[in-house]
Design a protein with these regions (language model features):
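The feature captures the beta-strand-to-loop junction immediately N-terminal to the Walker
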Residues: 37-39
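Helix-to-loop junction immediately C-terminal to a conserved catalytic motif
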Residues: 52
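Conserved ABC transporter NBD signature motif
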Residues: 60-71, 77-79
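Conserved ABC ATPase "signature" region
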Residues: 105, 119-139
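Conserved ABC ATPase signature
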Residues: 143-147, 151
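Catalytic Walker B motif of ABC-type/P-loop ATPase nucleotide-binding domains
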Residues: 168-172
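H-loop/switch region of ABC-family ATPase nucleotide-binding domains
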Residues: 204-205
Length: 254
């Protein structure tokens, strides 16, 4: 059996004296797309941030390719380079005078460890290919200050794609996209997992899209209420356990 790209065992996170995430365990295999679903305040973003070392975890372990990750601080550069993370609210100062090409190129630069003039040809080609994949090549010369919300999301996704990764983590990345853009987005994720073997972990509120596109689902409401295939995890009884009976009744009548 192959080693999981990422494995989480008994992870618990506290905010002050309250456990926002408690005793969560799951594993991600290469070439799979896993969704985290649950109501607002369920701990979905907290779980992601604890895995990445942005938030401290009270207990539990996180393993990367079978090796335990430290509970102290952020991930090592070696691990970080293999993970792309697109948070729900990616805030940056739009007054920074850089173009989309320059923003995406930052994802190629090995966390600033390489000289900026090294491998310029490969760098330019990687940026071009990343922008092509998200249908944003025409935005390359645009200053980031001029981008719309949807264009900004495409540029940030290109930043994630500009170099090979093992894991892509997305927090409501498809929110705000129109129907065609959303379809293209999920087609891109399918290509990443099928052709390049990326593992994908995404937070989503769109249960219909999760059912259609994801391989596994984690149902979270502080605890991991269930996990499995979409057909199993999104069955009515499990949705009641995660969201409550009123939510399921609303979906049934709408």
């Amino acid at each position: 059996m192959s080693t999981a790209v990422l494995a989480v065992e008994g992870l618990t996170v506290y905010r002050d004296t309250y456990a926002t995430v408690q005793d969560v365990s799951f594993a991600l295999e290469a070439g799979t797309d896993t969704a985290i679903v649950g109501p607002n305040g369920a701990g979905k973003s907290t779980l992601i941030q604890a895995i990445l070392g942005i938030l401290p975890r009270r207990s539990g372990d996180v393993f990367w390719l079978g090796h335990p990750l430290s509970r102290r601080g952020v991930l090592s550069p070696k691990v970080r380079q293999q993970i792309a993370y697109l948070p729900q609210n990616f805030l940056f100062d739009r007054r920074i005078p850089i173009t989309v090409n320059e923003l995406v190129a930052l994802g190629w630069d090995d966390l600033g460890l390489k000289l900026p003039w090294a491998n310029q040809k490969q760098r330019r080609l990687a940026v071009r290919r990343a922008l092509e994949r998200v249908d944003a090549l025409h935005l390359g010369s645009q200053p980031i200050s001029r981008l719309s919300g949807g264009e900004t999301k495409r540029a940030l996704l290109a930043y994630c794609l500009v170099r090979p990764r093992r894991l892509l983590i997305l927090d409501e990345a498809s929110a705000g996209l129109d129907v065609r853009s959303e379809s293209d987005f999920y087609q891109l994720l399918y290509q990443l997992k099928q052709e390049q073997g990326w593992a994908i972990l995404q937070i989503s509120h769109d249960l219909d899209m999760v059912r259609k596109h994801c391989d596994r689902v984690l149902c979270l409401n502080r605890f991991l209420r269930c996990q499995g295939t979409p057909d199993y995890a999104l069955a009515p009884d499990n949705l009641v356990a995660v969201y409550g009976s009123e939510f399921v009744r609303y979906r049934h009548h709408h």
